[in-house]
Amino acid sequence: MSYVPIVVEPTSRGERAYDIYSRLLKERIIFVCSTVEDHMANLIVAQLLFLEAENPKKDIYMYINSPGGVVTAGLAIYDTMQYIKPKVATLCIGQACSMGSLLLCGGEKGMRYSLPHSRIMIHQPSGGYKGQATDIEIHAQETLKIKRLLNELYSKHTEQELKHIEKSMERDNFMSPEEAKKFGLVDNIMSSRDAMTLLAK
């Protein structure tokens, strides 16, 4: 089991201990820092809804370091980001690949960032199925539907032509932060917190 640091804060009722992620949640910071799957997605969605209920007018900051994962789990997070009232700023730390890159570019326009040495990757969805031929055909058709949906979402958030997105997504497409900015996945590259503070003003 991985170790999660604990921070202790003094309160009027004595000291209170938080795991580091819960403490950062108090500052409206959410971490998407693992493979995207259903349990993890449910936790992220719950945090987004909690922060909206706490203050629907205050921005949320989502830090992303993810290799991607299950498409439906990623779409659950993405849809919630679009659904809630607060603006969601996204910041890539390390990597934002596959569904991680969709979450990155799905942040509020003008508030999508990357650190200077992160890697961003987009590609078409993949899947493996076995069984009767008819069932395999059904799953293949569903995969093609998801492929079209993802292409449309990337086109929407990057403001690029759908045909260009389709071509760019055909194989694993790795980008530097500069390339991701040119592509429209992020708006700015942050080398220091001061730079983000200046942009926020």
From Swiss-Prot:
Keywords: Cytoplasm, Hydrolase, Protease, Serine protease. It is found in: Cytoplasm. Its EC number is 3.4.21.92. It is an enzyme of class 3 (hydrolase). It catalyses: Hydrolysis of proteins to small peptides in the presence of ATP and magnesium. alpha-casein is the usual test substrate. In the absence of ATP, only oligopeptides shorter than five residues are hydrolyzed (such as succinyl-Leu-Tyr-|-NHMec, and Leu-Tyr-Leu-|-Tyr-Trp, in which cleavage of the -Tyr-|-Leu- and -Tyr-|-Trp bonds also occurs). The active site is at residues 98, 123. GO terms for biological process: protein quality control for misfolded or incompletely synthesized proteins. Belongs to the peptidase S14 family. Fourteen ClpP subunits assemble into 2 heptameric rings which stack back to back to give a disk-like structure with a central cavity, resembling the structure of eukaryotic proteasomes. This is ATP-dependent Clp protease proteolytic subunit. The lineage of its organism: Bacteria, Pseudomonadati, Pseudomonadota, Alphaproteobacteria, Rickettsiales.
